[in-house]
């Protein structure tokens, strides 16, 4: 969307506005270069600060003009190294449970609402590593399809068979209700206080929430004080840390800011389980899926190898 309607990108970053002349990919490239330059400059400033700090400690009192100027420069240097820095885009992939030989089989399912055919005789056998995007017009039956897969509703005919080792994590557009006076961090800790990552390490619940855009002060507020978008983000993160090996996501990027969405994209790119996602975001689908289910009129679902651009 940004590429089609804009020629320049302005970013508000740590109280400053940075201009990037070009498309979104150009912005990402130049932003990474700028952050790299900032990291080098910050490292040099920290080394100089250590040397100047030793001088400050040795100087009992600044009497001369040169000494006072050096102290002023030291104070400016201190402000530089203590200023906010850009958040590092760490790559955090939750450890998925083991997947057995049988994952999910859909056999000749049909679903109608009244005279409207939503799904017409669809079959599919899922394989390890499948990452499938689901696209179609609003109201064509995409969410109904996910509800059938997760056994939230039943098909009119046909069968869905889930493998014994499969644990589904289902993200819907309507998060489950939590008590309004429950703290955000307690909701997460109820699932797990330490999140097991794919590389064998673990991360505290608070640190994981911070990475995905829920800062510490928000973690200790009550659930009832969150906005609708914040509640959906919290629900998504709770699903991710429950270690599912089959993720089913219905419009997961709605209400996410661009940086949280980029972190989610990185997470899903590295995700080792199976994935099925409904989204209208073409860029998002291009990054994470390798196959599409395209909903056609009269309940027909066409399988297409490739991403949205393909």
Where are the regions a protein language model picked out?
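A general structural signal marking secondary-structure boundaries and capping sites
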Residues: 60-63, 78-81, 85, 195, ...
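Alpha-helical coupling/stalk and coiled-coil linker elements that connect catalytic or binding modules
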Residues: 52-61, 75-76, 90-96, 102-105
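ABC ATP-binding cassette signature C-motif
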Residues: 1-42, 92-310
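Active-site phosphate-binding and catalytic loops of NTP-dependent enzymes
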Residues: 82-89, 158
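Intracellular alpha-helical coupling/juxtamembrane segments of multi-pass membrane proteins
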Residues: 30-63, 67-71, 77-81
């Amino acid at each position: 969307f940004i590429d089609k309607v804009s020629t320049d990108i302005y970013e508000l970053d740590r109280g400053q506005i940075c201009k990037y002349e070009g498309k979104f990919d150009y912005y990402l490239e130049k932003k990474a270069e700028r952050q790299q330059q900032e990291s080098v400059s910050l490292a040099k400033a920290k080394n100089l600060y250590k040397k100047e700090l030793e001088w400050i400690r040795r100087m009992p009192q600044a009497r001369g003009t040169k000494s006072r100027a050096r102290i002023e420069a030291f104070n400016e240097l201190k402000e530089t190294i203590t200023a906010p820095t850009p958040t590092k885009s760490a790559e955090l992939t939750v450890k998925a449970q083991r997947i057995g030989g049988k994952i999910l089989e859909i056999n000749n399912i049909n679903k109608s609402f009244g005279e409207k055919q939503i799904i017409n005789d669809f079959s599919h056998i899922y394989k390890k590593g499948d990452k499938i995007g689901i696209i179609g017009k609003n109201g064509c039956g995409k969410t109904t399809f996910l509800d059938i897969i997760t056994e939230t509703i039943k098909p009119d005919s046909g069968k869905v068979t889930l493998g014994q080792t499969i644990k589904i994590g289902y993200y819907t557009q309507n998060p489950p209700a939590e008590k309004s006076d429950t703290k955000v961090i307690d909701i997460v800790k109820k699932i797990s206080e330490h999140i097991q990552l794919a590389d064998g390490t673990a991360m505290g619940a608070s640190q994981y929430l911070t990475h995905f855009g829920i800062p510490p002060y928000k973690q200790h507020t009550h659930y009832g004080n969150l906005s609708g978008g914040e509640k959906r983000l919290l629900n998504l993160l709770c699903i991710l840390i429950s270690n599912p090996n089959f993720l089913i996501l219905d419009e997961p990027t709605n209400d996410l800011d661009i940086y949280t969405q980029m972190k989610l994209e990185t997470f899903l790119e590295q995700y080792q389980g199976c994935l099925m996602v409904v989204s209208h975001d073409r860029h998002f689908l291009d990054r994470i899926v390798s196959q599409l289910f395209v909903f056609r009129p009269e309940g027909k679902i066409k399988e297409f190898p490739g991403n949205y651009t393909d």
